[in-house]
C-alpha cells in the first residue's frame, strides 16, 4: 500500500494547514494511508495546531508532530511550495529532531503543489534537502498561475468534515490580520468599519485600540456577518471567500482588482466540497499511484 506524508511547516492559522489536513482526511477515506506531519513554527506549540484543527473539524486523526521517520518508498506531498521553502528559510530555528524529520521527508519522492511565495529560494531549498529532479512531481492551478508548471490541480475545501457553524454574530465585519503585511493594510480601512473584528496573532505589531479575534477562534465562521477582503499581496487560494459562499455570507472585495491571483479566481468559483470533486484532484491520485 502506498503511504503519503503531507508535510506542513506553516503557522496554525495558515490556510495551508487546513488544506493539508483536509486532503489527509480525504486520501485516507479513499483508502490511501496518509499522515499529516507538522513541523512546528518556533513561535507555536503542538496545542496551538491541535486547537486550530479541533476548532474547525469534527475529527482529529493521523497527525504527527516534529518526530517522524518515513519508509524509504513513502511519498511526500506539500500543498504549496512554501512548505519546503519555509523549512529551508527557518532551518536554523528547528531542533535537531525537527531537522532530521525534514531531511527524512524531503529526501525522496515529492509531489509539490506550485506556488510563488519564494521563487528564488525554491530551487535552493530543493538542493538543500538533496532532492533529485526525477523524483519531484509538480501540480499547479493554472487559472491562478498562468505561467506555473505541472499538471492541473485545484485546492478545494473538504467541507464534509467541518463542524456545524453556529450563528452567533459578535462583530459585523471580519478582517484578516494574521501577519504584519495583512495587518498594515487592514489599518488603512478599519476606521470605516467600527463594528469590526481582526483575526490575528498576539504579536508586537498589532494596535491595541482595535478589536481582535486571536487565533484559534471558536466557531469563527459563525461570529461575523461580512468578511472584508483586503489582502494586498499575492493570494493563491483564499479559503474564506469560499467558506463565505458556502454559508451565504457577504464578502466585501476591498483590494486592488488589478491584482491577478487567486482572489478574482476564487471570487468567481462556486463553493464546492472536495468529496464531491474527485475529478479535480485526479492528477494527484494518478501521481500517487505512479510514484
Where are the language model's segments positioned?
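Hydrophobic anchor at the start of a short beta-strand
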Residues: 4, 33-35, 108-111, 194-198, ...
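N-terminal pre-catalytic "stem/leader" segment of glycosyltransferase-like enzymes
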Residues: 1-94, 118-124, 252-291
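Catalytic core of nucleotide-activated saccharide and alditol-phosphate transferases
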Residues: 76-188, 278
Amino acid at each position: 500500500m502506498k503511504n503519503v506524508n503531507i508535510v506542513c511547516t506553516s503557522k496554525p492559522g495558515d490556510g495551508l494547514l487546513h488544506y493539508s489536513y483536509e486532503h489527509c482526511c480525504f486520501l485516507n477515506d479513499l483508502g490511501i494511508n496518509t499522515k499529516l506531519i507538522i513541523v512546528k513554527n518556533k513561535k507555536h506549540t503542538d496545542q496551538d495546531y491541535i486547537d486550530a484543527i479541533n476548532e474547525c473539524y469534527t475529527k482529529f486523526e493521523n497527525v504527527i508532530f516534529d518526530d517522524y521517520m518515513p519508509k524509504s518508498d513513502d511519498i511526500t506531498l506539500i500543498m504549496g511550495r512554501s512548505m519546503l521553502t519555509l523549512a529551508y528559510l527557518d532551518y536554523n530555528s528547528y531542533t535537531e529532531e525537527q531537522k532530521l524529520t525534514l531531511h527524512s521527508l524531503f529526501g525522496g519522492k515529492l509531489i509539490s503543489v506550485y506556488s510563488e511565495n519564494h521563487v528564488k529560494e525554491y530551487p535552493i531549498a530543493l538542493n538543500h534537502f538533496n532532492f533529485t529532479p526525477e523524483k519531484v512531481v509538480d501540480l499547479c492551478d493554472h487559472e491562478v498561475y498562468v505561467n506555473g508548471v505541472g499538471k492541473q490541480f485545484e485546492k478545494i475545501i473538504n467541507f464534509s468534515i467541518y463542524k456545524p457553524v453556529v450563528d452567533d454574530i459578535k462583530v459585523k465585519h471580519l478582517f484578516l490580520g494574521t501577519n504584519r503585511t495583512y495587518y498594515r493594510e487592514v489599518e488603512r480601512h478599519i476606521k470605516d468599519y467600527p463594528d469590526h473584528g481582526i483575526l490575528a496573532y498576539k504579536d508586537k505589531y498589532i494596535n491595541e485600540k482595535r478589536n481582535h479575534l486571536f487565533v484559534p477562534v471558536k466557531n469563527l465562521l459563525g461570529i461575523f456577518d461580512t468578511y472584508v477582503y483586503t489582502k494586498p499581496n499575492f493570494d493563491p487560494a483564499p479559503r474564506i471567500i469560499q467558506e463565505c459562499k458556502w454559508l451565504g455570507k457577504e464578502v466585501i472585495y476591498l483590494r486592488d482588482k488589478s491584482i491577478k491571483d487567486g482572489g478574482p479566481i476564487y471570487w468567481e468559483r462556486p463553493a464546492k466540497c472536495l468529496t464531491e470533486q474527485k475529478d479535480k484532484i485526479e492528477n494527484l491520485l494518478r501521481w500517487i499511484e505512479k510514484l
